[in-house]
Amino acid sequence: MIEYMYRDTDAIEVIKISKDDEYGDVQRAVEKTDGRLLVIGHQFYPGKQAELSQDKNCWEFFYEQIQVPYDVRYNYFKVERDPKEEERVFNKLNPNNEPYIFIHEDAARGFLLERDHFLDRGLKVIENDVTENIFHFTKILEDAQEIHCMESSFKTLIDFYCEQDNIFYHDIRESQPLGQNSSPKWSVITYD
């Protein structure tokens, strides 16, 4: 997925880290950098929980960690789209071309969105298909009648590509608010 995202530039080298030897792979990659390494991540969260509860999202912390202005996120984002693959995924998940709701949740980790928040419960529901490249969902996202999602890569993609009304952020992960610098088009649904 990461290689796909950066396939149009030679300036970025993507290094695969195996699950079998994660520590060793990372150590070898670090040794090849000659000290030119930019570290961004969750390990810098300690003490930030109060800020997370005040509507700051994880991506905002990442930008702050490396002192990059938030607007860089929107002004320089680009992914070379693949219309054929987007159409293939669209046809796979919506073969009858019905109006639909797109939903992104993470049932495997217990993050289930409450369907009673759907505006039109009669619409077909299309869920994330983990066998497909997230970037091939762009047409599905753009054409959805409603979108419901939690904090995820899909939420980020929706931030960039979706202009329609009826886009809902389900705040089901207490440590992941929408964020102060996300697109204003989101309606937030909070969970107790």
Where is each model-derived feature located?
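Catalytic machinery of carbohydrate-active enzymes
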Residues: 1-192
